[in-house]
Amino acid sequence: MIFDTEEFKKRGKEDFESAWHAGPSVLTPPTTDLMYPRLTYLRAQAHPVFETIHRLREAYLAIGFQEAENPIIVDEQEVYRQFGPEAMAVLDRVFYLGGLPRPNVGIGKEQIQKINSILGRDLSEDEEESLRKTLHAYKKSEIDGDELAYELSGVLHTDDARIVEILDRVFPEFRALKPESSRQTLRSHMTSGWFQTLGAIWEKVPHPIRLFSIDRCFRREQAEDSHRLMSYHSASCVVAGEYVTIEDGKAVARALLSAFGYTDFEFRPDDKRSKYYMPDTQTEVYAAHPDHGWVEVATFGIYSPVALAEYGVGIPVMNLGLGVERMAMIMNKAKDVRELCFPQFFPIRYTDTELAAGVSLLAEPATTPGKNLVRSLINTAVTHSTAIGPCSFVAFEGEIAGKQIRVYVEEPEENAKLLGPACMNEIFVHKGAILGVPDTEKFAEVRKNGISTGISYLFAAASQAAAEIEQAAHFGIPTTVQIKMARLPGDINLKIEPWVMRYITDNNLKTDVRGPVFLTIRSEVLPTSEV
């Protein structure tokens, strides 16, 4: 809360020790949602693949490579130019782009009659002619598919819903359409774009040329598995110049991967021999990391002059590439690339701390006096916890909601303690389970290794009582709050977020907050004469 600085300055000069001890009085008691572990300051989590892309971009830029964007749609002819006789085997793994053909729609008497029936009127001669012209323009691709309904609604002077009905019932040709493949493919590897890019610029820019690109590639795998996806990201670069050799690949690999903590490197001949590389230049890069050990992280090679000649490129070119998803798997110690990339489709895993943040209270006071009442109730209850009933203790006397209120913690039953055995239980999350446990040897493991929610049964019950007393005070009436046997979270004013309950259910975990609370709190409104 905002406090009076002049008052504290004065009090500090008069009695420093007293003023210092009064410091906590300026703090507004927090609601449960503003208490740790519910109160958090979290950095939003980046997706591991895009976090890796970001780091790779920064690493490439730091070692002097300029960023480029290569064509993502590649004509199959480019694959023949790059791979030569090997092209057919490569094309077996690419995705061809296809589309729906434009139907040749005929309009005869039968079609006109059906349209008239749907519209509830006869088409005029001008409307018939305009309809034919519009469908013909669509056939010639002068009108886009997503604009056809709009154009027809203008021609036939009706709304889009009627047009959709006409297309469905009168022109079955649209429903019978089947996709037809083109000769265009989706890029299966970044190399298919580098040849085109280098062919366009190699004679127009200074050498050596150093470019990188990080983007999607698409490969028609037989099936996706824990290490392969049909759509993945490639982090690729080229160095082109008169004096480029295989040594450039080694130097670039070291410079790039050192940014990720790799220290030692080995370069091994790759058994795979892509025809767009020179013989004996395709090389696998293995690197050592303090956490990951030796792992294969990249491949490089020198482009074949046969392939370069197809694009008129007359200088040696070194190409290095690595799979972003593979790098992300290594960095995150992931076992399944599908789960790494698409965690939303896999079971969610929460830590005990994250689950504890989803446990709070159903009801609590809204005002500062009401929040202070909670403290008073707890202090009074703890102080007299072993008192035997019938007994009653004043916990609070003061103003709430403009009314003078007196509040008691009491036990009306004979030979019963003021607090039930479970009142001092505290809510912990341990191995995914939500448990209400006492401070005993039996539950030492839970209290030591679990995560406390910061909520005890007494705190939860006192908060509920304070909220109800606060509400009753607004109406100027007394109230009594009794918490008896707890069987469910709601019995002790406990709120568990739906996502937490779903996690507990999905993983066959448990919520156990059972226990005898037996706490009675009563308020009364004081007459003006007693104030």
Curated annotation (Swiss-Prot):
Biological processes annotated in GO: translation; tRNA aminoacylation
Annotated Gene3D superfamilies: 6.20.250.20, Bira Bifunctional Protein, Domain 2 (3.30.930.10)
Molecular function terms, GO-annotated: ATP binding; phosphoserine-tRNA(Cys) ligase activity; tRNA binding
Top EC class, one word: ligase
EC number assigned by the record: 6.1.1.27
Binding site for substrate: 189-191, 234-236, 276-277, 319
Keyword Membrane: no
Keywords: Aminoacyl-tRNA synthetase, ATP-binding, Ligase, Nucleotide-binding, Protein biosynthesis
Catalytic activity: tRNA(Cys) + O-phospho-L-serine + ATP = O-phospho-L-seryl-tRNA(Cys) + AMP + diphosphate
Membrane-crossing residue ranges in chain numbering: none
Stated family: Belongs to the class-II aminoacyl-tRNA synthetase family. O-phosphoseryl-tRNA(Cys) synthetase subfamily.
Subunit note: Homotetramer. Interacts with SepCysS.
Physiological role: Catalyzes the attachment of O-phosphoserine (Sep) to tRNA(Cys).
HAMAP family: Sep_tRNA_synth
Protein's name in the database: O-phosphoserine--tRNA(Cys) ligase
Organism: Methanospirillum hungatei JF-1 (strain ATCC 27890 / DSM 864 / NBRC 100397 / JF-1)
Source species taxonomy: Archaea, Methanobacteriati, Methanobacteriota, Stenosarchaea group, Methanomicrobia
